[in-house]
Amino acid sequence: MRVEYGSVEKDGSADLDVDWLADGWVALLRRWLADAEAAGIAEPNAIVLGTVDAAGRPVTRTVLCKSVDDTGITFFTNYGSAKGEDLASTPYASATFPWFALGRQVHVRGPVTKVSAEETADYWSKRPRGSQLGAWASQQSRPIASRAELLDQLAEVTERFADHDTVPVPPDWGGYRITAEVVEFWQGRESRVHNRIRVHDGRIERLQP
């Protein structure tokens, strides 16, 4: 169950250092995303999204990050889903990119806001039609009697939009942006003496593992 990570001496892999953030956290995160994609990691933009419900109980799930910029990271979902309800009561979240095969992870946390309708529409237009229909068919996080019933709902919306060249954005669907209040880069190293670099309040600092 234990994984041994690399080191400069062991495999020649360079140590994560504050200098790697000379161009800012966005540049390094994008570079690591590209490295994960090049390594063949499935869905390298997957994040473990953490929220808390109205009672303060934490919940995590995996979603896909769809954009990274100087303001933060963005994902899209059903606003009426469990995560949407959590964010309505506590608009703060954490997100972790877990690249186990590379011995890397990046953690982002901060306040959450909905993106504009224009940004949602732009992303929606790039989704495959099947994904668009699936978003209409599913009342996300709500109970359903069977998969057959879910497929019936999909068939119904497929028929409803059969004569439409484009499928409109559902009224309860859109994006959220996590404003990057804290960003932490982690690199697994030999003997569990890992590298951790945190960006917070304009400061870049090394943390003990």
From Swiss-Prot:
InterPro entries: Pyridox_Oxase, Pyridox_Oxase_CS, Pyridox_Oxase_N, Pyridoxamine_oxidase_dimer_C, Split_barrel_FMN-bd. FMN binds at R61, T62, V63, L64, C65, K66, F76, T77, K83, Q105, Q140, S141, W186, R196. One of its GO terms (biological process) is pyridoxine biosynthetic process. Its cofactor is FMN. Binds 1 FMN per subunit. PROSITE patterns: PYRIDOX_OXIDASE. Substrate binds at R2, V3, E4, Y5, K66, Y123, R127, S131, R192, V193, H194. Signal peptide: none annotated. HAMAP family: PdxH (MF_01629). Belongs to the pyridoxamine 5'-phosphate oxidase family. Catalyzes the oxidation of either pyridoxine 5'-phosphate (PNP) or pyridoxamine 5'-phosphate (PMP) into pyridoxal 5'-phosphate (PLP). This is Pyridoxine/pyridoxamine 5'-phosphate oxidase. It comes from Mycobacterium sp. (strain JLS). The gene is pdxH.
